[in-house]
Amino acid sequence: MKSRLRILSILLSLLVVQGCVIIGYRNHFSRDLTPEQQSKVVWNTPDERLLSLKNDGRIFAINGKQMQKMVQPHPKAIVYQWSPHCTSEACLSLSAIQTLCDNNGITLFVVADYFHDAFSQNQILTYPLFIANEKHYKTDVCHKLEKRFYIDLLGEETYNATKEISWYRYAYFEKGKFVRYIRDPYVELDNR
């Protein structure tokens, strides 16, 4: 009986590892983009300021310090870590979160987890869609890329103090300063 359990646990472990390999836990798959999609991705240099951007259908690969500069001039802002295929209640559609932010005087910045399906939904947003710059951070592994991006955005001390709840997906800022993560924007933001 023990050997059967051991074999079963090994098989289950292999399935999980196999799933990780298939899924890849790779972030953007930028190498898999079509030439047309590649032409719509702007790989900015780390020191480039993006304050005057409007949504023209392109996706901007940026780092956390650049996002921090973009958030600063706005009285209220949210950085939404958006995953195109997330089915959780915590993952609002781009149109829903943009409307909610517009109705509550909040500037919305969306950072996509990956490129897949991001191009088709980019038009909904006031600002262009962003993605963490895998070239700047020299990795396309999801958890490493997100960690480096959010350390740059929040600062290492704040990141470490909040990493237990960072999966909430919505980082809320006032006057350029990180205030908190938001779990449910409808409950915590809707002032109607």
Question: For the regions a protein language model found, what residue spans apply to each?
Answer:
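C-terminal motif of bacterial Sec signal peptides marking the signal peptidase cleavage site
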Residues: 16-19
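Short active-site neighborhood of thiol/selenol oxidoreductases, capturing the structured segment around
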Residues: 68-96, 109
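Extracytoplasmic/secreted cell-surface and envelope-processing proteins
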Residues: 88-90, 118-120, 180-181
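Conserved segment of the thioredoxin-like fold in thiol-based oxidoreductases
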Residues: 109-149
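Thiol/disulfide oxidoreductase modules built on the thioredoxin-like
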Residues: 141-192
